[in-house]
């Protein structure tokens, strides 16, 4: 089985927290809020290494979001 190398990106937020669906749009992982809702509901997103199905989940600096072989670090 081939191991997929995951790319890492650091995304800075200017507020105390950001909701998961807004974060996915901010880092250009998805194009629309509707797409963000679908990928989160489908269990395609991991937050801090756990599958997350709450699109309103609050992300804070230090959290990580994994989607489509990219790990986004919230800073």
Predicted features and spans:
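Short, well-ordered loop/turn sites that connect or cap secondary structure elements
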Residues: 30, 39-40, 59
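Ferredoxin-like alpha/beta domains used as RNA- or RNAP-binding modules
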Residues: 1-27, 51-75
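Short, structured beta-strand/loop micro-motifs enriched in basic residues and often containing a Trp
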Residues: 42-50
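C2H2-type zinc-finger recognition helix
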Residues: 33
